[in-house]
Amino acid sequence: IGRTKEANEEIDGDERPETSHLTRVDLKEDGKGLKIVRQSLPYGTASGTHGLYFCAYCARLHNIEQQLLSMFGDTDGKRDAMLRFTKPVTGGYYFAPSLDKLMAL
């Protein structure tokens, strides 16, 4: 995943495997990080239906698209190792316009 198991500390970028989740989603363009705000919430029980609700927000759709392309190996053929243990079931993109955009309608 890109963190130590013992202390849950982030592994330095040079030492992280190329397929770690952090390596696949901690992307930079022109030296600047592709910023997103993310929140996740686990649901269910260990013995029953269970999973993780994940929501991300960003100013540009490009940021999330690049992360997804990287996770699924479309950029360099290396897939996020987390995908060996998880199963994406559904997803969606939603546009939340600014107040200025709404007022201009």
Predicted segments with their positions:
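Long, histidine/aromatic-enriched segments associated with O2/redox biology
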Residues: 1-105
